Amino acid sequence: MGKTLYEKVWEAHEVRKLKNGQSQLFIDLHLLHEVTSPQAFGMLKDLGLRVRYPHRTFATVDHIVPTHDRTEPFQDPLAQSMLEALRANTREHGITFFDLGSGNQGIVHVIGPQLGLTQPGMTIACGDSHTSTHGAFGAVAFGIGTSQVRDVLATQTLAAQKLKVRRINVEGRLAPGVYAKDVILHIIRHLGVKGGLGYAYEYGGSAVEAMDMESRMTLCNMSIEGGARIGYVNPDETTFQYLEGRPYVPKGSEWEEAKRRWLAWRSDPDASYDDVVTFRAEEIAPTVTWGITPGQAIPIDGRIPLLEELPEEERPVAEEALAYMGFRPGQPIKGVPIQVAFIGSCTNARLSDLREVARYLKGHKVKKGVRALVVPGSEWVARKAEEEGIAEVFREAGFEWRMPGCSMCLAMNPDRLEGDELCASSSNRNYKGRMGSPRGRTVLMSPLMVAAAAVAGEIADAREVFGLAGVR
């Protein structure tokens, strides 16, 4: 019987089985940021321990950094202290740190792949829930807590429970104006925010195989919103084309050997799965959320569900969502006014995201009264976008072009909603208060849909705003 990629990677990295049913796994790559690492380093110091393998550990600053004015000290003294702590800890332990202005600073899940640190067959850990992003390369990537960050720093291992594997096939061809963000929202809408509990998700099928790497990253990024701890795609030629020539990947003859080695991680044709689910790409439309979980999503031309249409166990959360969002059952989502538009986050702030939006945004203007921000995922992305004229397209349209960071995705920096503002967002979470205001509202969608909402001043169909029919 064949094995899945997940099983192969697990077995190759299993140091030992633990008495509690978990396994101790060797971690190939440990990524750090400023929020979940200070306490971990503090615990390490209290125990009198050093970082076990500094050369397998890399750090950046992303969550707390201002994206408008980076003059130090920051206005927020806590943010400044977290940055200073990361600088001191990485310096003390000999860890590579991509600091502000280094040319490689950015959102941790953007810079890992961008630098070629993320590679097929790896086990990867980071103190951030969206570490599943790296699974797009055929890696098994764990989002971990602070005490586990300490464990990996000290031992380069992680205690973990082996998961079941669900294969999610997306077959067919996506229509113009439909992107990976729509695919993952569609999947979560149908499988639920708890549907992936206890599972690793393996994404495949012709639509996934046709995706570029940055689209696959979007898909894997939001596995966690569907309840799965792990999401991955089998490595292929698309993976190799993306990785070739990046700073941390093998070069020359070692590159050819690496590709042969990486292909061996692919799930075997006769691998057995605990569950298989198939979706048709042609049935997926531009999708947006209407509530307070990513699973509360509908096609752009749909209506918010009537309570009686929902399973009984979903009705209390739906009622809570309707009250919080100020929506009513049966209401069309299209046409709802927005006050803020945000393109950014570890889900959708890569160069391909910005290129695609700029392609259609050129010649359009942000609606008066809408505050629109675009926040590149890294200094490299920002630099390339400037070189290609992408940044200027956004500026001309009326978007604020910001510096890299997590920005509005979470309320840990100055980019926040005010009052009950409604934000059309390319991020990954629409929880109550997620964007800083206890009454702020978030509607998740693809970057192009965010741009369409910014131009229209309301939630809109990008295919109509930008005339996408028959394009691509």
Swiss-Prot record:
A GO MF label: 3-isopropylmalate dehydratase activity
CDD domains per record: IPMI
Cofactor note: Binds 1 [4Fe-4S] cluster per subunit.
Enzyme class: lyase
UniProt EC number: 4.2.1.33
Highest taxon of source: Bacteria
Keywords: 4Fe-4S, Amino-acid biosynthesis, Branched-chain amino acid biosynthesis, Iron, Iron-sulfur, Leucine biosynthesis, Lyase, Metal-binding
Co-factor requirement: [4Fe-4S] cluster
Assigned protein family: Belongs to the aconitase/IPM isomerase family. LeuC type 1 subfamily.
HAMAP family: LeuC_type1 (MF_01026)
PANTHER family from the UniProt entry: 3-ISOPROPYLMALATE DEHYDRATASE, HOMOACONITASE, MITOCHONDRIAL-RELATED
Subunit structure: Heterodimer of LeuC and LeuD.
Name under which the protein is recorded: 3-isopropylmalate dehydratase large subunit
Gene giving rise to this polypeptide: leuC
